[in-house]
């Protein structure tokens, strides 16, 4: 297929070519992969031309930038496993101008097979993010990659993660680093530090995380007895502007709504009510779970533990201490039945817990619901052959194209993570979708479901909004 880049893709390609270390904050559907591959293709051609003619007719060097003295290859692409398995290799085969690029995926291989692939000569090597520590140890000081592409830069948002600590040791040896993400701030501005550090070594936001925090943040939730800081907030409204300005020279941000003519996206919150008996049972269990928490010192960890139980209750079943599934209600199952009966198209259901999946499959067994796992499952969905598809949002992230199979999403249980939520919805609502997408969200009134909607819609720091919502639930229960 002949590649005719849109103007926004030309902008992205030029930005990569003109910035040795950069990040593209591009919404889903704007073509991050093909833009990056095209930039690498252009850079390689430019390198070959200048190597053949190092001196221009006026006697000056054709190599105006240090990085241009090197080929962009070998290039390492680090991506989520599903993306690493097929997306980059498929993209090269899709476009005529890229077909000569030698791209190999080492994702999902045994260590022995992975070593074999990495010892072979290729232009681009693609690995899954989970093996980054192994990869760094494997190469040691002999890091061979001229370019590193971080295809989901936000996967490196945690400075305490093994993947960040490992890559930090070697990434300065690469001449070019390209970060790609549509969600650079999944939980707020604190998440930005380690992502930018991999690009500039701390030049813009500070050499250490501590320095970054002291400059731009103040403690929010603190245990004053121990001095432990549980969460932070921006020091002032100006802090956001200062951070944005500091990284603006190496970060390009583009929103799909500004560049794509997309069909409408409709969010439909379906509010459900428990009958009095079930509501009483829910509130009793809610109180039981909350009473186990140190309400004077609520942490994100303790809040998350209780909220998981409360989310199970809202969905209709809970796991007992022995691991058995205890049925509570079928309010969401009944609502889902109504949606299925009235829908003419195929439906993609995002579930939250294993018992959600089991109950949905049992309730709709006559429709033979399918979990989207294998390549064949994805093909059958996109061919329109699956009426009811189920997927966990963590399995429906970056690089999964499902827009051909349908235009209806049902959230049986919403996630807390905005990143998961946006990425999952973007499996159907992306470039190539020809119909308006409707996202049904099953929300049980007076439960933690309401808190989830509030957090996802909040413009506050995600962690802060999460804790605020939980504290309000505690106060309303005790």
Spans of features found by a protein language model:
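Conserved Helicase C-terminal RecA-like lobe
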Residues: 1, 18, 31, 35-47, ...
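Conserved pre-motif I regulatory segment
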Residues: 1-25
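Conserved P-loop NTPase motor "coupling/switch" region that bridges the ATPase
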Residues: 67, 72-74, 120, 147, ...
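Conserved Walker A/P-loop ATP-binding site and its immediately adjacent core
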Residues: 72-94, 186-191, 353
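Conserved helix-turn-beta segment of the N-terminal RecA-like "Helicase ATP-binding" lobe
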Residues: 83-109, 199-202
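A conserved SF2-helicase RecA2
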Residues: 416-478
